[in-house]
Design a protein with these regions (language model features):
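Glycine-rich phosphate/pyrophosphate-binding beta-alpha loops
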Residues: 156, 160, 217-231, 298
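ATP/NTP phosphate-donor binding region
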Residues: 1-69, 76, 116
């Protein structure tokens, strides 16, 4: 196996990730690349605000590789920036997870990064990774035009989205991270805000169906919430979206054990749960302000259309 050559590389690091530890990790990464010559030339830029990583990735012309150093949020921004570039010149993506979720990194096989050992970068290979495209409409914007956003791992609507979005404030209060944080947020959301979400759904152009969903997850990778295996068989390189949704009305007493069983992917055979695969999905929401998340970031919409862009992004993946 040949040693990895990232070529000219841009490192985009969120210095606030992992309670500020990511800044030190970025400096160690610089020294590692310098000593091992894994990149012919590299530049390090620290993000300064929300959306900055997207801007930097969009402007990363002339680079072969962009390394996203941070959690799922900074990776999501970097992916959205890279997807604005023409495919012929679009840099490849590498990730070093320094966050609280890290589902995308786990899908790539990077699940034990400590911030000190960069061994995952020593022997990597390029693979073509699917990307999800979201077209969303928000009447409050007044434009009537769709907003386009991309995601690399997870899109969901309903109680699971509320759980994911609720982890931000809960992390500040508790200091928890990863699956324990997501589980605690789940117990909180089920206790305070549990409900069914009426919506109309259509997959691959089939006739629309009205459902009362408690969750609607449209996945590229198998997990969300730091390891919850919501779509256990999802493959981010197969050109297909994997969908898990639970239709109600589902009583809270049934839904909570179902949520907990999803940690190990044991929910898929339960009666309220439906599993399917598609390339295109359309969701129209009957009420405003449904919780919607893409890679843990909020989406505001009354209607969304989702497509899979097969093999749209080259991604460096550690070889086993």
């Amino acid at each position: 196996m040949h040693a990895t050559d990232f070529g000219r590389t841009l490192i985009i690091a969120n210095p606030a990730a992992q309670s500020g530890a990511a800044h030190e990790v970025a400096e160690r990464l610089q020294r590692f690349l310098d000593m091992t010559a894994r990149a012919s030339q590299f530049d390090l830029v620290l993000t300064e605000r929300m959306g900055h990583a997207k801007e930097l990735a969009a402007q990363a012309t002339g680079y072969r590789t962009v390394i996203a150093l941070g959690g799922d949020g900074v990776i999501h921004e970097v992916v959205n920036g890279l997807m604005t570039q023409d495919e012929a010149v679009r840099p490849a993506l590498a990730v070093l997870p320094v966050g609280s979720g890290n589902d995308f990194a786990q899908t790539l096989g990077i699940d034990d990064f400590s911030g000190k050992d960069f061994g995952a970068l020593l022997t990597c290979e390029l693979q073509r990774q699917d990307i999800g495209r979201i077209r969303s409409w928000n009447p409050a914007s007044g434009s009537g035009e769709a907003t386009v956003e991309y995601y690399d791992q997870t899109l969901s609507v309903g109680i699971d989205a509320a759980i994911g979005l609720g982890t931000t404030e809960l992390r500040k209060k508790t200091g928890l991270a990863g699956a324990p944080l997501y589980t605690l947020s789940g117990l909180e959301q089920f206790g305070l805000r549990y409900r069914n979400y009426p919506m109309t759904v259509s997959f691959d152009g089939a006739p629309a169906e009205r459902v009362r969903a408690i969750i609607m997850a449209i996945q590229l990778g198998p997990t969300y919430g730091s390891g919850y295996r919501i779509c256990p068989d999802a493959d981010p390189c197969d050109g297909i979206l994997d969908v898990c949704y639970a239709c109600g009305p589902v009583p809270r007493a049934v839904a909570l054990p179902m949520f907990l069983s999803a940690k190990d992917g044991h929910h898929t055979k339960l009666p309220p749960v439906r599993m399917r695969r598609c390339r295109h999905a359309e969701l129209t929401f009957e009420e405003p302000d449904y919780p919607i998340q893409a890679d843990g970031e909020p989406v505001v919409a009354s209607r969304i259309e989702v497509d899979v862009l097969g093999g749209a992004l080259h991604v460096w993946r550690p070889t086993r």
